[in-house]
C-alpha cells in the first residue's frame, strides 16, 4: 500500500497547472468550492491543489475571512474550473462580523457547481453535523454534487476508521492528506467527473457604470483590462466598503473590525468600454505586528499587490488624520514608483464642516508630508457612496496620464531652460549644468540626466525640477525619478 500511496502522490504533483488561456467568448467555467468548519485544512488543500501559497494556512481557527478563488487548468487532463476557498462555517455564537462572513460563504455555496466538504479524520463535531444538515436541506445547495473528503489521513484508513463518517450518512468518503498531497489526484478526477458536460457558472460579475449597476456575466480569467488598481490603507480605513461601493454589490466582507479583509480580492470591473482589475488588499499593519504568523502572508501579499498594480488608491480615515503609518505607506508607494491618489474616506463623519475645512485638511496634510502636494486628493464616503464615481473618474484619468512620453529634444530644451532660470540660487558652487537627458520609463516618470557634477544637484534643486516637470507634463500623482550621472569626458 505504501508504494501505491507514493505513486498517487507523484501523480498528484503533475496534475495541476494554473496557467490558463483566456476564456473563449460565451464559454462558462464551473466553480468548485471547498467547505467545512474551521481548522479542518481547507486553505491547505486549496494551496496544495494550486501548488502555491495563495490562501493563509496556519493552525488557528478563522484565518480565511473572505472567499478566495483561482483558476485550475490543464488541457491534457481536461481540467478547467475555478477553485474557491471559503471561511470556516462553524461559528456557534456569531457576532456581527462572523454573521456577515457566514452569509458571504453561504452565498458562495449557492453559486458553486461542485462542493468539496472537508472533514477532519481526528474529530467530528456538532458543527460538522450542522453544516451537513444545511447542505442537505438548503434548496439551492441540496441538489449539487458533494465530494466528502476526510483530511489528515496520512496513513491508510480501514473500515473501522471510517465508521463514524458512515454513521453520518456518508455512503462514500475520500481519505486525503492536504499537507502530504495524498489522493489529490483522485479528488481532481472526482471533480472532473461531476463537472463533465456541466455548463458551469460565472464566478465574477460585470459591473455596469450606470446608476442601476446591474450585474452581468464576465469571465474572471480574461486579462484584457486597461490597468490593475489596488486599494491600500491601514486597517479599518474602509477599503472593503469602498470596494463594495465601486462594485455596487457586496463582494468583500465588510465590518468595522480592523483587519477584516486578510486576503487580497481581485474583481474585474467594466465602466462603459473601459475595464480595470480592482484589488482590495489586506490592511497593512506595522512591521512589528506583521511578523506574527497570522498576519505575515497577508502583509506580504499586500506588498505584492502594490508591486503588481498599475495604480493605487491610498485610503485615509478622515477622523484619524494622516498618521505616521500613513507616511510609511506613502513612502512605500513612492519607493515602488506607483502612480497613486489619496481618497479621504468617512468625510461625512466630520462635523461642522465649512468651505474651508477641506483646504485646512490639505494644508495640515502637506505640512506633514510635503511630497503629497503633487498628489490628487478627493474626499469620499464609501458607505454613503459619496463621490465614488468621481474617484473612479480620477483613477482612469491618472491611468491615462501615467503613460506620458516626452521627446528627448523637448526634455533637454525644457530642463536646460529651467536650470538656467535657477542659476546659482540652488548651489553654492558653480552653476550645475545638464549635458544631456533621456526618459527611460513612464511609470514612474524616470529620467537619466548626465551632468557636470552630481554633487551640485542638491535636494532643493531636484524638488524644483520635479515641480516644473509635474506642472508642464501634468504628472500629478505620478512619481518622478531623476537619476543623475556625471559625464566627465
Curated annotation (Swiss-Prot):
GO MF entry, a single one: GTP binding
Residues at which GTP 2 binds: 233-240, 280-284, 345-348
GO BP annotations listed: ribosome biogenesis
CDD domains given in the database record: EngA1 (cd01894), EngA2 (cd01895)
Stretches assigned to the EngA-type G domain: 30-199, 227-403
Family: Belongs to the TRAFAC class TrmE-Era-EngA-EngB-Septin-like GTPase superfamily. EngA (Der) GTPase family.
Biological role stated in the UniProt entry: GTPase that plays an essential role in the late steps of ribosome biogenesis.
Protein name, as recorded: GTPase Der
Native source organism of the sequence: Leptospira interrogans serogroup Icterohaemorrhagiae serovar copenhageni (strain Fiocruz L1-130)
UniProt lineage: Bacteria, Pseudomonadati, Spirochaetota, Spirochaetia, Leptospirales
Amino acid at each position: 500500500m505504501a508504494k501505491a500511496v507514493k505513486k498517487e502522490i507523484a501523480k498528484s504533483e503533475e496534475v495541476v497547472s494554473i496557467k490558463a488561456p483566456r476564456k473563449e467568448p460565451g464559454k462558462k467555467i464551473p466553480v468548485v468550492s471547498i467547505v467545512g468548519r474551521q481548522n479542518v485544512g481547507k486553505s491547505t488543500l486549496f494551496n496544495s491543489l494550486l501548488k502555491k501559497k495563495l490562501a493563509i494556512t496556519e493552525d488557528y481557527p478563522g484565518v480565511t475571512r473572505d472567499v478566495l478563488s483561482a483558476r485550475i487548468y490543464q488541457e491534457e487532463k481536461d481540467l478547467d474550473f475555478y477553485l474557491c476557498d471559503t471561511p470556516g462555517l462553524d461559528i456557534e455564537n456569531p457576532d456581527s462580523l462572523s454573521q456577515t462572513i457566514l452569509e458571504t460563504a453561504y452565498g458562495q455555496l449557492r453559486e458553486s457547481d461542485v462542493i468539496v466538504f472537508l472533514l477532519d479524520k481526528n474529530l467530528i463535531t456538532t458543527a460538522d453535523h450542522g453544516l451537513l444538515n444545511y447542505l442537505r436541506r438548503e434548496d439551492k445547495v441540496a441538489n449539487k454534487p458533494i465530494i466528502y473528503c476526510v483530511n489528515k489521513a496520512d496513513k491508510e484508513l480501514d473500515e473501522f476508521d471510517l465508521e463514524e463518517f458512515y454513521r453520518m450518512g456518508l455512503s462514500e468518503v475520500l481519505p486525503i492528506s492536504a499537507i502530504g498531497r495524498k489522493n489529490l489526484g483522485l479528488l481532481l478526477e472526482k471533480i472532473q467527473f461531476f463537472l463533465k458536460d456541466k455548463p458551469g457558472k460565472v464566478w465574477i460579475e460585470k459591473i455596469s457604470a450606470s446608476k442601476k449597476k446591474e450585474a452581468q456575466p464576465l469571465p474572471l480569467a480574461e486579462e484584457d483590462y486597461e490597468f490593475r488598481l489596488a486599494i491600500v490603507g491601514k486597517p479599518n480605513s474602509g477599503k472593503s466598503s469602498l470596494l463594495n461601493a465601486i462594485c455596487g454589490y457586496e463582494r468583500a466582507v465588510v465590518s468595522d473590525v480592523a483587519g477584516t479583509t486578510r486576503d487580497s480580492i481581485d474583481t474585474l470591473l467594466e465602466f462603459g468600454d473601459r475595464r480595470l482589475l480592482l484589488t482590495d488588499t489586506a490592511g497593512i499593519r506595522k512591521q512589528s505586528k506583521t511578523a506574527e504568523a497570522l498576519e505575515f502572508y497577508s502583509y506580504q501579499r499586500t506588498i505584492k499587490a502594490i508591486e503588481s498594480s498599475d495604480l493605487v488608491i491610498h485610503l485615509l480615515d478622515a477622523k484619524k488624520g494622516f498618521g505616521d503609518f500613513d507616511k510609511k505607506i506613502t513612502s512605500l508607494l513612492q519607493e515602488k514608483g506607483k502612480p497613486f491618489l489619496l481618497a479621504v474616506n468617512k468625510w461625512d463623519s466630520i462635523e461642522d464642516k465649512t468651505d474651508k475645512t477641506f483646504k485646512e485638511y490639505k494644508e495640515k496634510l502637506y505640512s506633514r508630508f510635503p511630497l503629497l502636494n503633487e498628489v490628487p486628493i478627493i474626499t469620499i464616503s464609501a458607505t454613503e457612496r459619496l463621490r465614488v464615481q468621481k474617484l473612479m473618474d480620477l483613477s482612469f484619468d491618472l491611468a491615462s496620464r501615467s503613460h506620458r512620453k516626452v521627446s528627448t529634444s523637448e526634455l533637454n530644451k525644457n530642463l536646460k531652460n529651467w536650470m538656467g532660470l535657477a542659476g546659482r540660487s540652488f548651489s553654492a558652487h558653480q552653476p550645475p549644468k545638464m549635458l544631456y537627458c533621456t526618459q527611460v520609463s513612464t511609470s514612474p516618470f524616470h529620467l537619466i540626466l548626465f551632468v557636470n557634477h552630481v554633487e551640485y544637484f542638491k535636494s532643493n534643486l531636484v524638488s524644483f525640477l520635479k515641480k516644473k516637470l509635474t506642472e508642464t507634463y501634468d504628472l500629478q500623482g505620478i512619481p518622478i525619478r531623476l537619476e543623475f550621472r556625471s559625464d566627465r569626458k
